[in-house]
Amino acid sequence: MGSIDGTRPKLSKDNKKLLKKQAKAKHILLKHEGIETVLHLSQSLVVANGGLGNGVSRQQLLAVLERCGKVETLLMPPNKPYAFVTYSSAEEAIKAYSSLSGQELCGEDAEQPITLYLSFVEKVVVKEVLSPSLPPGLIIVEDFVSPEQERTMLESIDWDSETSSQKSLKHRQVKHYGYEFRYDNNNVDKDKPLPGGLPDFCTEALRKCVQRGLIKHDPDQLTINQYEPGQGIPPHVDTHSAFEDEILSLSLGAEIVMDFKHPNGSVVPVMLPQRSLLIMSGESRYLWTHGITPRKFDVIQVSEGQTVGTISGNSGELTLSKRSTRTSFTFRKVRHSPCDCAFPSECDSQQTQKEKSPPTVGELGASTLEREYVHKVYDDIAGHFSSTRHTPWPKIGDFLASLPKGSLVADVGCGNGKYLGVNKDLCMIGCDRSKNLVDICRERTFEAFVCDALSVPFRAGAFDACISIAVIHHFATEERRIAALQELIRLLRKGGKALIYVWALEQEYKKNKSKYLKESKTSQGPSSDALGTNLAVKAPLPIHTNRTSFHSQDLLVPWHLKPTNKSKVTPENKEQNEKEHGPDSVYHRFYHVFCEGELEAMCNRLSNVAVQHSYHDQGNWCVILEKL
């Protein structure tokens, strides 16, 4: 390194290279984090690339920094690629600046070494952050089982037995007892209990729960999951109508941090130590989602006394903990009556009672209708929906293939990310209103985030192209459909192109039936009469019969969430099939299906676009637009 006392000795080629990279690191810190470095000497430094977000633990960084002197404070903000260090004297800070800048450090899980870049900062402010409280109704019992009992339970799991109660789920092992837990709807088939009940090796742990008064109901369903480092659980609430109040989770083999999220957006990370028992009841069971972020390290408290409870955001107390193989035993009691909990807004039993008759737009209002009959539905059916959406449509693939290499493309309403990986030569970013669908995108390593199509958080003119596939037809009024179109065009640069697909009223066009009609196995009529397309009319929306022609433009379309292992259903065996497997869970999605010329006319109302091409593709009206 060159001198920092104002003189300018001749620099070697390596030193010049280091100073250039150090200047770049300063620029990045200022641009993205707002951290201002200073040219004069001080006791405090910012260590770029030396953060928890780079996979550098507190112990690892501290060992390097202490070579240069006594460290007074070391702040490591969660998930950030930098840290702040304050030495007891400016001389020690100068020594660190001179000797550690450019030093390589191997992160806990880094494939390549990390290079540290140090810069002086004026002052490091230590902000005291209190640990959040546990969600109401959440209890953690530490050391619930002994190490010997833990070993016995883990060794008793027969992962190799080939039964219907064992499956491989997204590369992790899972085993069910009592009833098979269905991950597509967080429920069980109550009419199909598994033989054998709960295993004997769990008896002692359950007896202890009863003796300590931790549970009111004896569990009759158990799911065992084995998680390797890097695996997680999407945020969810176990279906209210499926299980009784208490849900128990026993963590064996390793500790883990589980995230609890309130509907208001507040998140509480909770440490579950090895051999601890988690009990969710009341508000924590019915209102808060719980999940585990898929990663190989957790951010935890560094203090040894903080072995259980919530994780604070105090950057002076955080470090990384490398995950190990964790096996969770989740015990539930199957419910056989409707849920009557104190959280009706989140309760499927109480919502079903309110929604026995189809809604009217006048009663709900457009945004409420979309929230109840689009947003919530897609979150509930995300897994099943994604499993049916895997093959890109050829003409959409052709559009993406026609774009220049390196184009920046937004997929607004990307769903499960089916089109995000079609053309590897493009830089594609997806967004969707459904968090569960976005989670699926992230599992597939696509770039995607949650937002509303009416307000996409990107600057105007940022994209070379946009696609909107099967999105705009979910908006309940013409004004909102036009607003969604305007937002799409706002994202485009001048000369940028957009491809838009919406469902067509004309499922048979020029004597050719769409695939939607061709897949119909019956010729049933609509399930209710068409009630008109004027959304101001306070009449119930008609419920469409799947695989038939449309008789109204504004309607509800059913989605049948099918039980697993369901046999082929025909009119002749329908009654027997439902007796054996249970009926489908039915969700209704709002659609406005477009008539011929409607989409093109809507586009022509915008002054800054030109319709390049308009066509009908498999029951959809489609346009390609260019921004003027």
Curated annotation (Swiss-Prot):
Residues 569-582 have a biased composition (Basic and acidic residues). Zn(2+) binds at residues 240, 339, 341, 347. InterPro entries: AlkB-like, AlkB-like_sf, AlkB_tRNA_MeTrf/Diox, ALKBH8_RRM, Methyltransf_11, Nucleotide-bd_a/b_plait_sf, Oxoglu/Fe-dep_dioxygenase_dom, RBD_domain_sf. Its EC number is 2.1.1.229. One of its GO terms (cellular component) is nucleus. Fe cation binds at residues 236, 238, 290. GO terms for molecular function: iron ion binding; S-adenosylmethionine-dependent methyltransferase activity; tRNA (5-carboxymethyluridine(34)-5-O)-methyltransferase activity; tRNA (uridine) methyltransferase activity; tRNA binding; zinc ion binding. It catalyses: 5-(carboxymethyl)uridine(34) in tRNA + S-adenosyl-L-methionine = 5-(2-methoxy-2-oxoethyl)uridine(34) in tRNA + S-adenosyl-L-homocysteine. Gene3D superfamilies: 3.30.70.330, Alpha-ketoglutarate-dependent dioxygenase AlkB-like, Vaccinia Virus protein VP39. It is found in: Cytoplasm; Nucleus. PANTHER family: ALKYLATED DNA REPAIR PROTEIN ALKB HOMOLOG 8. This is tRNA (carboxymethyluridine(34)-5-O)-methyltransferase alkbh8. It comes from Xenopus tropicalis. The lineage of its organism: Eukaryota, Metazoa, Chordata, Craniata, Vertebrata. The gene is alkbh8.
